Amino acid sequence: MKQSVGHRIFLLSPAYAGGERARMILRGQAQFPLARQLRGKSGAPIADVFTFLSGLYFRGKIAYAKAFARAPRGTSGVLVITPTRGLIDARTRIHLDDLREFAEVDIHENDPRYRMPIDRDARLLGKKLSDQSEVILLGSIATGKYVDVLLANFGQRLRFPADFVGRGDMSRGGLMLRCAADLQELSYLPVAGAIVNGKRPPKLAPRRYTGHFASGD
């Protein structure tokens, strides 16, 4: 049975697993803490790994989503889109082999290695949510790689932050980190029919963070 009250679930676009920072962490001789975690038996949370790979953008996404998610009982409110594993809880621990697998697949809406798992998970999630619930995509809506499969499963429930329009990744990351620290939630627009290009907003003023916002934890 669907929930009778609205919930808010966040879907975070993934960090690129084929770049230089990924190669750093995949090197067998890497000795920094996160690399050792990935090689260890317990692995490392995917949120920590993607924050390392992506920097400010993913750090902002995870902080923002944690601050404002409202999930049904038994469902994670913060899910990460992956190249091959569908939607997974941001707390899920991964290992080096998982990261290597992600690096082998460039996300494209027509690649079944990506499309089939995310379609499966989005369909299951959609059944748990009421029509009043919102699924917030913290990622690009300018191409079909995320939007096509998610819109097919969530319809009008799929939304994105209005303030993303006109901003690049770094600006979006800084904005979300600031909003999470101030507990000021952004407004959202339906993805269906959205205008994806707009005037670039003013540059954010520099800001220092303390505590867990300083490290992205």
Regions found by a protein language model. Name each.
Residues 1-217:
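Peripheral peptide segments
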